[in-house]
Amino acid sequence: MAESIEMGEELVSSPSTLLALKGKLENPSPDDATILGILGKKTPTVKMEKGKGKGDPIEAFLLEFVDERRQVEANKRLRQYIRQLKMSHQEELTAHLERASAENRANLKSMMESQAESNKTTKTILATLITLRDHVIEEGSKKPRGLDKDQIKLERALGFERGYSSAIAIVNQLKVTEPSQVCKPSVRAAALSAMEKGEFESSGEVFKAVVKRAKAELTK
């Protein structure tokens, strides 16, 4: 015991001996390392897979600032967090796209209904125009029919009757005592002439002709 203490004091008191011991501790020989238990007690470290993380900024960050034995766990947790963020963002994006798709479908349905109604109106207008065109073509192709003999006789009789009745009315208004003064062949001729000029339709002209002729007869 005393000898050990003396040897310890001798080692501490000798600077050269301390330097030699320090060198052995820093760079021990295999035998010294086995004796000292350095290799047996060395802390195990977790190595990153070869090639993994090459060019990856996340793993480059971990390699630089995180202890090697905790890099794998940190990398795993960080990637899980990134996946959660992506999934959350994906859910929001999916919901937004579904809402936009529903709105677009509703707008498209409304546009299609409006287009169908517009097409229906357009077809109705086109059908009306085609009908009018066909009617105009049909009417334009018809030739005017002339009056037959019976119609001519009837028109003449009606025209003369109107003119003759008008002449009698004038006679009554003028209080002529003898209606025969205006009911002469000249009055009838005037009525027939007016009917000829008016193509059997102008009763106004017949009336004017008869009145003019009747007044002329009355002033004689």
From Swiss-Prot:
Subcellular location: Virion; Host cytoplasm
Chief localization: virion
Post-translational modification: Phosphorylated by host kinases.
Record key words, sorted: Chaperone, Host cytoplasm, Phosphoprotein, Viral RNA replication, Virion
The keyword Disulfide bond is annotated on this UniProt entry: no
Recorded GO CC terms: host cell cytoplasm; virion component
Superkingdom assignment: Viruses
Subunit structure of this chain's protein: Homotrimer when phosphorylated. This trimer is stabilized by binding to the L protein. Binds soluble protein N, and ribonucleocapsid.
Function: Non catalytic polymerase cofactor and regulatory protein that plays a role in viral transcription and replication. Stabilizes the RNA polymerase L to the N-RNA template and binds the soluble protein N, preventing it from encapsidating non-genomic RNA.
Full protein name: Phosphoprotein
